[in-house]
Amino acid sequence: RYMRVKMIVAYDGTNYCGWQIQPNGITIEQVLNEHLSRLLKEDIKVTGASRTDAGVHSLGNVCMFDTNTRMPAEKISYALNQKLPEDIVVVDSCEVSDDFHPRFSKSRKTYEYRILNARFRNPTRRLDTYFYHYPLDTEKMSEAAKYLIGEHDFASFCSANSQAQTTVRTIYDCTVSKAGDIITIRVTGNGFLYNMVRIIAGTLVKIGGSDMPADAIKGIIAATDRAAAGPTAPAHGLTMIGLKLSLIHI
């Protein structure tokens, strides 16, 4: 009897070349496959909901795999966490129905991009926060963020080497908040294009640190041209907070 197992995985992406297996570096997917295969004594291949880029962190990526093991699904996380490197943790594991698939599910994904806006670096936040020392107008950034909400063609916010069939996405919420020296850009959407959240962050930083008006975002969206938006903010400031999946029955 085989079962399908869903896992929620948190990781510090600093030392990894992203989620997806690739020939020239170690990835989260590869580490999970190796440890699961060893633990369950069979060849395991996980499928992730979100293929985060190199250096990007996660508090709740979702993946699944099929197995013939007799080990109860909820015990797998405990057994795995004893063997995994300290920068990867399986937060939860459970059995799911055969029609569950993280890629073909409707999802709401939430990302946070964190900026340390201060005169000096903070060495304790260097791995998960982008240091930017020029003053930023968070009120204006917050106002600009509201224009991103809704269904739009986000071609301006997509890296040129994206393989997406369509650049239309829906953003449900986009906020900018400040606590102390840390500015947090929080974005929830139904899916994101390649580097989209980092380009949104870079564009909001450009608006917040210049005399560009908040509603410049409208023109940037309308241009559907990557050159119209701001720079791609560095990967290490980005954390995938989590995602909610609901099944689409095909």
Predicted segment positions?
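Structured-RNA-binding interfaces characteristic of tRNA pseudouridine synthases
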Residues: 2-247
